[in-house]
UniProtKB/Swiss-Prot annotation:
A zinc finger (C2H2-type) spans 420-444. InterPro entries: Znf_C2H2_type. Keywords: Activator, DNA-binding, Metal-binding, Nucleus, Transcription, Transcription regulation, Zinc, Zinc-finger. Transcriptional activator that controls the onset of premeiotic DNA synthesis by regulating res2 and some other factor(s) in a mei2 independent cascade. It comes from Schizosaccharomyces pombe (strain 972 / ATCC 24843). One of its GO terms (cellular component) is nucleus. GO terms for biological process: regulation of transcription by RNA polymerase II. GO terms for molecular function: RNA polymerase II cis-regulatory region sequence-specific DNA binding; transcription coactivator activity; zinc ion binding. This is Transcriptional activator protein rec16.
């Protein structure tokens, strides 16, 4: 009798404890949801009494299609063998594809922090990233740290990949004969392939010769066949305008594959029509008429190219405007100028087809960069027909990929506030103060054609106008 009574009491206690456990579980679920959502939501709690329904969600609100916000909680609460309080489902899902973040968000954060502190003691930070310290003690600590964790060591090491080959682009502002201004796009990498015999391992190498004054820049000798890398440190932001600069490039000129010892003698450069200038090309400092392709060893000269030089008679469509003369004294102090040469007249000036003008020395540095990027897209559009119009209308900074071109351009000539040409210089000045000191020695010329207030400049200030920059 006593044994039966004890058995009955034990069964009653087990039943009561299971009932309490079930009620406690439901109460925890109810309190959990009430703590997560404001009390203004009517949860419509309906307690379940059947044993088969234990573990199911007791809230009818989740069955309503008008409450999609609770679908995540409903999935967690209704899933059997899962507790809604441990957030197993959320924790098992990776929050990022970054391996460092995946390690940091690991469950055992204390172990990760210990690992990170150990690894930080093993490496020193410099310009090349995290570099290991050379000592026997550090090597021993490194092996100890690797044995304490299974996480990869490279997760904390900065991995620098070699940047893609830069597509050096030069944007030139060209003043046409009728006073209109236009932009010209040139890809320097296509030109750099012209001297593979001299610099086969330099993909960005460019020719520099004593007569190729447009390619003269610091760190390069004037010996025949000398090349240099456009991406070296000497092409930094010389004017502190936030732009990287390259060597000066005169559009309209094609390099030959090889130069002889006498420039333009047996390997004359090939000329391509690029400037819609005055149809008559005159010899320098003379009024003898247009220069033909046989004069001054110039090969395949296109008469549509305009030669600009000292005392050159520049005429517009009416023939009554002369290009102002500029004294060449200050050109020799800061690099070689485009229209100054020790050779006989009519060689590189005629061959290059004019002085390319850049508009980078202004208050609107970002505006100039946008102009260059927009013009580069125009030049690329005719070659890339697969690009959609939506991609072309998006600024490059917002749609840039790893293989996109890097726009590199510079300032020449430098324009003062009074809209005068300060100087034509293939090597930019190293600082603004040096430019201001040098500006006093510049021979100011008349206002450049095409820079009227209704064209490129606003009234009064002499800088790029908003109408010229807003079309982006």
């Amino acid at each position: 009798m006593d044994s039966d009574r004890c058995l009955t009491d034990e069964i009653s206690l087990n039943t009561l404890s299971s009932t309490f456990a079930s009620d406690n579980n439901l109460r925890r679920k109810e309190n959990f949801l009430k703590s997560r959502y404001p009390s203004k939501f009517d949860l419509n709690v309906s307690m379940l009494t059947k044993s088969d329904d234990v573990g199911k969600t007791p809230f009818s609100i989740f069955d309503s299609p008008s409450n999609p916000g609770f679908s995540r909680s409903h999935q967690m609460c209704s899933d059997k063998n899962k507790s809604p309080f441990l957030f197993d489902k959320i924790r098992d899902e990776p929050v990022s594809v970054d391996p460092v973040k995946l390690i940091i968000n690991n469950r055992n954060k204390r172990k990760i922090n210990r690992q990170k502190s150990r690894l930080q003691g093993l490496y020193r930070s410099d310009a090349n990233g995290l570099q290991p310290l050379n000592s026997e003690n550090v090597k021993m600590k490194k092996s100890t740290a690797l044995s304490l964790t299974s996480s990869p060591l490279n997760s904390w090491k900065t991995d620098f990949k070699t940047p893609p080959k830069a597509n050096v682009v030069c944007i030139s502002l060209v003043i046409e004969g009728d006073g209109c201004a236009s932009l010209l796009y040139e890809d320097l990498n296509q030109i750099s392939n012209s001297c593979p015999e001299v610099a086969p391992n330099r993909q960005n190498a460019l020719f520099s010769d004593e007569t190729l004054t447009t390619m003269f820049y610091s760190g390069v000798t004037e010996d025949e066949g000398s090349c240099n890398n456009l991406l070296q440190s000497s092409f930094g932001d010389d004017l502190d305008l936030g732009m990287q600069r390259s060597a000066t490039w005169a559009p309209g000129y094609n390099y030959p594959s090889k130069f002889d010892s006498i420039p333009f003698a047996s390997a004359s450069p090939k000329i391509k029509a690029a400037f819609p200038f005055d149809p008559n090309v005159y010899a320098l400092n003379t009024n003898d008429g247009p220069v033909t392709s046989t004069d001054n060893n110039c090969d395949q000269l296109n008469t549509r190219m305009q030669a600009w030089n000292n005392g050159f008679n520049y005429s517009n469509l009416n023939g009554d405007i002369q290009y102002p003369a500029v004294t060449p004294k200050f050109f020799q102090q800061e690099g070689r100028a485009l229209n100054v040469s020790d050779c006989n007249f009519g060689n590189e000036e005629i061959a290059y087809g004019g002085i390319p003008m850049r508009v980078c020395h202004s208050d609107s540095t970002l505006c100039d960069a946008r102009i260059a990027a927009k013009q580069a897209l125009k030049g690329k559009r005719q070659y890339d027909t697969s690009t959609s119009k939506a991609e072309l209308s998006t600024p490059p900074s917002k749609r840039r990929h790893i293989d996109d071109a890097d726009l590199v351009f510079h300032s020449s000539p430098l324009l003062s506030r009074s809209r005068f040409i300060c100087c034509y210089c293939t090597k930019p000045f190293l600082s603004i103060s040096k430019l201001q000191e040098h500006e006093s020695s510049c021979s100011h010329v008349e206002r450049l054609f095409g820079f009227a207030p209704n064209r490129l400049y606003d009234d009064g200030d002499g800088f790029l106008g908003s109408s010229f920059c807003s079309d982006w």
